[in-house]
Curated annotation (Swiss-Prot):
Highest taxon above the source species: Bacteria
Designated name of the protein: Dihydrolipoyllysine-residue succinyltransferase component of 2-oxoglutarate dehydrogenase complex
Entry cofactors: (R)-lipoate
Domain Lipoyl-binding as annotated: residue spans: 2-77
Keyword terms, alphabetized: Acyltransferase, Lipoyl, Transferase, Tricarboxylic acid cycle
Organism listed in the record: Rickettsia conorii (strain ATCC VR-613 / Malish 7)
An annotated GO cellular component: cytosol
Domain Peripheral subunit-binding (PSBD): 111-148
Reaction equation(s) it catalyzes: N(6)-[(R)-dihydrolipoyl]-L-lysyl-[protein] + succinyl-CoA = N(6)-[(R)-S(8)-succinyldihydrolipoyl]-L-lysyl-[protein] + CoA
Taxonomic lineage of the native organism: Bacteria, Pseudomonadati, Pseudomonadota, Alphaproteobacteria, Rickettsiales
Length: 395
């Protein structure tokens, strides 16, 4: 019986994808749930597994092809591998007697995921020398990065005098989507950015005082992001328009707080969402952000992790950014930009003191948020971070 291989549901509002990599070819035997191919959507890369045992009877859509949800991309002849197993057994045994066994199976380039193959090629690595830790011994991106880290210190410098000076690389669907959405945001929203600065002295002191006890009790490190998430929620409650969006001729005010946290990955920027962050404690916020960030870097985020979000936070400070104007993530109406904390001279009670200061920025849609509201939003965050006890006491 022939069983169709179809493009699965890709999540909310996603109707099209690109075939990134086939791991099987026509005639190959497959088992139920064995990896067949990877499909790249505008947000994540998804695996498509075999629905039954059999052999690949047809591949109708090749790598690089755009496909729609529910579209047939191939078929499996169910049970075909089982019918031929008996006849193949004897020849397999004969080959086992006459052919020497390799200590380490070769890894063909066509078994590597596109992102992994790219790393291997760019760093001139032999995949046969990389131990795979993924499913069925597959080489993961982490395996390649670990190999790079262990070899870079001893590897001789490579002259690039004879290499091509220009490399043309096809944009991934994720990169195309990032480019399109950011440009759409600029073309649609009336984006305005307002700035403020925060004295980080008290929140740094509070973190230093309790970070070891916090980690021991909650099994997660106490960072600054949880303070900013909680402060942001209080500011959103004070200024509801920042948590709203425009839908046609209507303004939609949201009475829940799903906070998107921007994460930079090798494939591009993604914004996983911390759901109902207002109902979480500091430890749960830190754990959730840590899990989502790890999944983002490993390419394991689901569509649900990336969908929705009422407001976003982007922390360019981790890369050393001192000041920036973040771009709104549509259909949201605002995004908070955090930056590098550095010691600066400030006037405190008429005296010059050295304090750890951070610039913060709010980019917002001026169609729905007035200037007064934007400034008040940042002032509220400033007040809470400079007096973190108010966050803890819900003041």
């Amino acid at each position: 019986m022939r069983v169709k291989i179809i493009v699965p549901s890709l999540g909310e509002s996603i109707t099209e994808a690109t075939i990134a990599k086939w791991y099987k070819k026509q005639g190959d035997s497959v088992k139920t749930d064995e990896l067949l191919l990877e499909i790249e959507t505008e947000k994540v890369t998804l695996e498509v597994n075999a629905p039954c045992n059999g052999t690949i009877g047809k591949i109708s859509k090749t790598e690089g092809a755009n496909v729609a949800v529910g579209e047939e991309i191939g078929e499996i002849n169910e049970g075909a591998s089982a019918n031929t197993a008996g006849t193949n057994n004897e020849s397999a045994k004969a080959q086992a007697v006459t052919q020497p066994t390799s200590e380490k199976p070769a890894v063909a380039n066509n078994t590597l995921a596109p992102s992994v193959q790219k790393l291997v090629t760019e760093n001139k690595l032999d995949p046969n020398n990389i131990k795979g830790t993924g499913r069925d011994g597959r080489i993961t991106k982490g395996d390649v990065l670990a190999t790079i880290n262990t070899t870079t210190t001893s590897a001789p410098a490579i002259s690039k005098s004879n290499e091509e000076r220009v490399q043309r690389v096809r944009m991934s669907r994720l990169r195309k989507t990032i480019a399109q959405r950011l440009k759409d945001s600029q073309n649609t929203a009336a984006i305005l950015t307002t700035f403020n600065e925060i004295d980080m002295s008290k929140v740094i002191a509070l973190r230093n005082q309790y970070k070891e006890e916090f980690e021991k009790k909650h099994a997660v490190k106490l960072g600054f992001m949880s303070f900013f998430v909680k402060a942001t929620i209080e500011a959103l409650k004070l200024i509801p328009s920042v948590n709203a969006e425009i839908d046609g001729d209507d303004l939609v005010y949201k009475n829940y707080y799903d906070i998107g946290v921007a994460v930079g990955t090798e494939q591009g920027l993604v914004v996983p969402v911390v759901r109902d962050a207002d109902k979480m404690g500091f430890a749960e916020v830190e754990k959730t952000i840590g899990i989502l960030a790890k999944q983002a870097r490993e390419g394991k985020l689901s569509m649900a992790d990336l969908s929705g979000g009422t407001f976003s936070i982007s922390n360019g400070g981790v890369y050393g950014s001192l000041l920036s104007t973040p771009i709104i993530n549509p259909p949201q109406s605002g995004i908070l930009g955090l930056h590098k904390t550095e010691e600066r001279a400030v006037v405190i009670d008429g005296k010059i003191e050295i304090r750890p200061m951070m610039y913060i920025a709010l980019s917002y849609d001026h169609r729905i948020i007035d200037g007064k509201e934007g400034v008040s939003f940042l002032v509220k965050i400033k007040q809470l971070i400079e007096n973190p006890e108010k966050l803890l006491l819900n003041l």
